[in-house]
C-alpha cells in the first residue's frame, strides 16, 4: 500500500512514512518498504513494534536539514547533547534492513571546515544543541540492524539504550571523520548485544560501551560481543567509557582490524561504575597522532580509571550524581589483551587514580612497532577528561604504567624505529 511518500529528495516525507509505520504496527506488524532509486527527505520518525523498516538498494532516507523540527532530546531533560531523528522507546521486534542508505546529512548541521575538524554552529541557547542523532533506540527487545549503509551523522549515529537481544550485522557506518561527537555505535545500559561484520569510520569512537546517568533505570551493560569489524577513528576505535555510572561486564571483542586511528583500544572509566571481565583478542591496529581537538595521543592500548573533571551547574543531575558537581571513579579489573599486533607513534598506557582502581591487566602475545609517521610532537600520554593535568609528558615506552597493580606481560615484544622515535625509553617504565 502506498502512503503518499514522494521520494523526490525535496518534500519532507516523514508524515507519510509515519503513517505507514503506524498502520503496519497496528495490524500486528510487517514491512515498511522504501523503494529503490528514490531519496526520502524526512524529519523525526517514531519507530514501532513488529516493524521491518526495509531500504531497497539505491534508496536513501535523508535527515531534513531544518534544525527547528527536532524537538525531542536524545538525553531526556539534558538538551545540550543533541536531539532525536529516527527513534523509539520500549518496543519489541524492530528490524532495519536492506542495502539502501540512511543519510544523517551531517554537514548541513556544521559550521566552518577547519584543517582537523568542523566547527559547530554558534548556539542561540548554550543548553540546547539541535544536531540530530541518527538512530536513538531506547528499551528495544529483539533488535536487528542488518546490511544497511548509514552515512554522515551529525552527532551520535546508532545509540542503543537499555536494549536487550540486539544484532548489528554487516552494516557500513561511514561518518565524516572531521565531525566531532560523531560516534558510530554506542551500546548504553544494554544486554546481549552482538556486533559483527561491520565497517565503521567516524570522527569520534567507532564502537563505545557505556552507562549514561540519564538512563540508569536500565541497569548494567553486560554480555557484549564484537567480531569481524574494520574501524577507523580520530578518537578511539573501540572504547569502554567514559560515562559509566553502573557496571560493564562480560565483553568479548575479537578478530578486528583498526586502521588510521588515534587510539586503538581504550578503557576510559571516569565515573563510579566498574569494568570487569573484558577480553580483546586477535586485533591488528594502526594508531597515530592527531590534533588536540581529539582525545588521545595515539595510545594503541589504553586502560584507565580517573575521576572526571569537576563540572558546573549544567552538569549536575546528569554528568555527576544527583545534585553534585564532582564524582569518583570505579574499578577496572580482569582485562585481557591476547594476540594484538600494533603499529603506533606512542606506547600503551595503563593508569588509575589510585593503585587499586586498575588491577589485573593481562598482556599476552602483544607485539608493538613504534614508528613516527606524522609531524605532531610525541612523548605525551592523554588522561582527559580528568581532574588536574590532562597530559603526562614522558619518553615513549612500549607500556607506560601509572598507579596500577597486577599488570602482567607474557610475550610482549616492542620494536622501535629509533631514528624516528629518538625519545624511546624502553619496553616498559616498570
Regions inferred by a protein language model and the residue ranges of each:
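Extracellular/periplasmic carbohydrate-active domains that bind, remodel
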Residues: 1-430
Amino acid at each position: 500500500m502506498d502512503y503518499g511518500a514522494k521520494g523526490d529528495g525535496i518534500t519532507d516525507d516523514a508524515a507519510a512514512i509515519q503513517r505507514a509505520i503506524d498502520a503496519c504496527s497496528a495490524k500486528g506488524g510487517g514491512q515498511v518498504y522504501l523503494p529503490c532509486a528514490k531519496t526520502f527527505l524526512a524529519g523525526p520518525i517514531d519507530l514501532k513494534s513488529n516493524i521491518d523498516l526495509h531500504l531497497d538498494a539505491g534508496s536513501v532516507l535523508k535527515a531534513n536539514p531544518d534544525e527547528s523540527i527536532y524537538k525531542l532530546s536524545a538525553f531526556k531533560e539534558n538538551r545540550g547533547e543533541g536531539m532525536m531523528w529516527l527513534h523509539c522507546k520500549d518496543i519489541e521486534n524492530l528490524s532495519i534492513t536492506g542495502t539502501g542508505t540512511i543519510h544523517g546529512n551531517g554537514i548541513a548541521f556544521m559550521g566552518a571546515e577547519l584543517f582537523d575538524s568542523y566547527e559547530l554552529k554558534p548556539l542561540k541557547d548554550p543548553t540546547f544543541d539541535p544536531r540530530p542523532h541518527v538512530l536513538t533506540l531506547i528499551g528495544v527487545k529483539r533488535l536487528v540492524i542488518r546490511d544497511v549503509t548509514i552515512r554522515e551523522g551529525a552527532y551520535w549515529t546508532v545509540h542503543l539504550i537499555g536494549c536487550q537481544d540486539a544484532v548489528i550485522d554487516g552494516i557500513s557506518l561511514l561518518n565524516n571523520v572531521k565531525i566531532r561527537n560523531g560516534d558510530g555505535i554506542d551500546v548504553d545500559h544494554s544486554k546481549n548485544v552482538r556486533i559483527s561484520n561491520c565497517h565503521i569510520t567516524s570522527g569520534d569512537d567507532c564502537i563505545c560501551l557505556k552507562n549514561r546517568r540519564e538512563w540508569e533505570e536500565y541497569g548494567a551493560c553486560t554480555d557484549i560481543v564484537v567480531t569481524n569489524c574494520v574501524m577507523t577513528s580520530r578518537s578511539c576505535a573501540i572504547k569502554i567509557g567514559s560515562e559509566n555510572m553502573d557496571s560493564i561486564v562480560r565483553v568479548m571483542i575479537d578478530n578486528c582490524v583498526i586502521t588510521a586511528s588515534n587510539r586503538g583500544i581504550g578503557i576510559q572509566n571516569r565515573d563510579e561504575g566498574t569494568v570487569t571481565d573484558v577480553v580483546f583478542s586477535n586485533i591488528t591496529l594502526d594508531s597515530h597522532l592527531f590534533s588536540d581537538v581529539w582525545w588521545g595521543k595515539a595510545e594503541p592500548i589504553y586502560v584507565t580509571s580517573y575521576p572526571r573533571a569537576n563540572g558546573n551547574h549544567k552538569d549536575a543531575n546528569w554528568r555527576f550524581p544527583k545534585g553534585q558537581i564532582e564524582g569518583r571513579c570505579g574499578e577496572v579489573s580482569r582485562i585481557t589483551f591476547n594476540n594484538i599486533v600494533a603499529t603506533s607513534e606512542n606506547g600503551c598506557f595503563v593508569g588509575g587514580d589510585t593503585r587499586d582502581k586498575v588491577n589485573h591487566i593481562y598482556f599476552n602475545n602483544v607485539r608493538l612497532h613504534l614508528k613516527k609517521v606524522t609531524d605532531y610532537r610525541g612523548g605525551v600520554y592523554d588522561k582527559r577528561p580528568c581532574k588536574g593535568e590532562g597530559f603526562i609528558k614522558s619518553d615513549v615506552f612500549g607500556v607506560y604504567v601509572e598507579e596500577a597493580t597486577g599488570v602482567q606481560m607474557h610475550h610482549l615484544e616492542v620494536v622501535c624505529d629509533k631514528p624516528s622515535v629518538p625519545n624511546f625509553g624502553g619496553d616498559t617504565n616498570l
